[in-house]
């Protein structure tokens, strides 16, 4: 369903991601795990046709991200790290607007809006102004706009960032429900976030893939290995590079 081959993106001399290759099958819920600045959002933006890559290829359902972006936008829904909300709009009106942007036929707009309001538990706030909602509800509105056109694939970039513990639990539950009918890519820098929602994990560090495997297999591998924590006071980047060249060192972060 999603095929990524040797994907790279540079900002001037800095490489944000380098030679990423992975596949995601239909119906999978895949976690994209890595620290802040690892390249997760850059990858999500490329998959969502928002940002061009420097090199490599991406195909989604057979469509080329760089040459057939309009076709891909019909089958994906994207929630960026900062939800694209208009704080002065009423929830219902905003979702109707989002439906028009996604070319939902006018005759189907009302039913599409009502469906996402139901799925995202927004009924009690549907007539309220977005800017006056809690962060948890605003995140629900962000997810609702991502799925307003009933896409096959949902790409969620840090969907619980900045939420309180109760709101995090509620959003996790919502994503788990959506996973029953969508292919989902979820990025996060929080390990429990990934372990509670995803079946397979792609670990990214410094713009490169460190591991791709099922959650169970990765857990087994981590249990077998040893982890060493070092406090580096100077020339940290140089030391990190040298550590990566050592035999039997799987990852350095």
Go through the PLM ranges and name each one.
Residues 224-253:
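Short, charged/small-residue-rich alpha-helical element at the C-terminal edge
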Residues 216-221:
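Short acidic-hydrophobic catalytic motif
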Residues 196, 210-213, 234, 238-241:
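Generic recognition of short, well-ordered alpha-helical interface segments
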Residues 198, 205, 222, 232-234:
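Generic secondary-structure microfeatures
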């Amino acid at each position: 369903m999603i095929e990524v081959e040797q994907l790279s993106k540079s900002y001037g001399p800095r490489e944000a991601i380098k030679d990423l290759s992975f596949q995601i099958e239909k119906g999978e819920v895949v976690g994209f795990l890595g620290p802040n600045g690892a390249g997760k959002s850059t990858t999500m933006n490329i998959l969502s046709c928002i940002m061009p890559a420097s090199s490599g290829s991406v195909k989604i359902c057979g469509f080329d991200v760089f040459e057939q972006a309009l076709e891909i936008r019909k089958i994906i829904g994207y929630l960026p790290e900062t939800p694209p909300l208009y704080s002065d709009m009423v929830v219902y009106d905003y979702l109707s607007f989002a439906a028009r942007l996604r070319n939902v036929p006018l005759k189907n707009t009302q039913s599409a809006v009502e469906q996402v309001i139901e799925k995202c538990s927004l009924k009690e706030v549907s007539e309220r102004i977005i800017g006056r909602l809690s962060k948890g509800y605003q995140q629900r509105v962000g997810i609702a706009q991502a799925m307003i056109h009933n896409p096959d694939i949902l790409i969620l970039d840090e969907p619980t960032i900045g939420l309180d513990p109760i709101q995090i639990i509620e959003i996790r539950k919502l994503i788990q429900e959506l996973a029953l009918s969508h292919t989902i890519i979820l990025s996060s820098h929080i390990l429990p976030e990934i372990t509670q929602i995803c079946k397979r994990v792609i670990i990214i560090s410094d713009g490169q893939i460190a591991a791709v495997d099922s959650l169970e297999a990765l857990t087994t591998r981590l249990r077998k290995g040893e982890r060493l924590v070092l406090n580096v006071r100077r020339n940290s980047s140089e030391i990190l590079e040298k550590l990566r060249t050592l035999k039997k060192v799987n990852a350095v972060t």
